[in-house]
Amino acid sequence: MEIRFTRAARSQFQKALRFIASDKPSDAKNFRLTAERSLGRLSDFPESGRVLPEFPDLPYREVIVSPYRFFYRVENDVVMVVGVWHSAQLLGEPE
């Protein structure tokens, strides 16, 4: 299964990496690698992320790479990452 990011999710991920790198560049690199590895598992196990506790009736799941939450949905043979939020942010309903 292919993994893709929406334009907004890609922007949020890059913003998170820049924020982490502003304090400690090596942490940003490690975070990126950990996120890529965690999201990569979704290729084989797309339902392995947890259902969003805030919106259990919506078709979205999440993978947590602390302190960020990667929100996704499965569309046919694609895992579509739709958002990347810091865990301290308030979550609005996904679009």
Pin down the residues of each PLM region.
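Basic, Lys/Arg-enriched alpha-helical interface segments
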Residues: 2-60, 78, 94
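Enriched for short, Lys/Arg-rich terminal
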Residues: 65-95
